[in-house]
């Protein structure tokens, strides 16, 4: 087994924070647009999942897939029980299995199946697989008839297709285990530039005749993930990671990504909006 990359722990922490922020719109009384980052956070987490997936032993498919189930579904079942007891949620077993963890869990369980067979038979052709997936996603998005206000990162199944690219990207970089040198100024500017370009292109979703152009967001989003990964593997971030309290917090948040994703929307309340922005700190805590 290859050595664990601690940058992934840091990256998962970032992913958890931005995904959580994207669901906090009721906590921004006058600045709802700041409740953003969901697409970036999802891309980061799919990247992290792909990065670590091939580092462990694979073995027979049924045993390997059971290990994936055992890592995810105990938390899903636990939250289903707590949600029923504390918040009055009503879930039957079919609903829990199919959507109890939200779209993300259902999606990643499907990705696991695809990635197992890709690892088994196409490991040497990951770049080709990545290219084919991108071409298929782009072709499908261009050809399908979508509403004029269609959001490719919003509700619906289309995002299940294109987020697979980020999991493949993570798998490729996880296997390579290449050392990246982070340049604070230039790589920092590239990261900021990718984020700015992503949101600029993402704005096309609100312009009916240019709605299809939002698929170009994949390019800066891939860049955002890459430079975030470089940042998290920088010497500075590794020093921060090894600080006792900060490092413990990063490990805790990164290790509880799934749990945070499941419970967050049930805990958010607008009853403290009068003390904005301190209500955000309370909710994050």
Protein language model features and the residues they cover:
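Membrane-interface helix-boundary motifs at transmembrane edges
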Residues: 2-5, 57-67, 117-129, 152, ...
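Alpha-helical transmembrane segments of polytopic integral membrane proteins
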Residues: 17, 47-50, 111, 170, ...
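Interfacial loop-to-helix transition and helix-capping segments at the boundaries
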Residues: 30-42, 93-107, 144-169, 201-228, ...
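Alpha-helical transmembrane segments and terminal signal-anchor/GPI-anchor hydrophobic tails
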Residues: 161-164, 178-284
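Transmembrane alpha-helical segments and their boundary/interface "anchor" motifs
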Residues: 12-15, 39-46, 53-115, 186-195, ...
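Membrane-anchoring hydrophobic segments
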Residues: 4-7, 14, 26, 30-35, ...
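Aromatic-anchored segments of alpha-helical transmembrane domains
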Residues: 17-25, 79-88, 132-147, 191-207, ...
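Hydrophobic alpha-helical segments with transmembrane-like composition
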Residues: 45-46, 52-55, 83-178
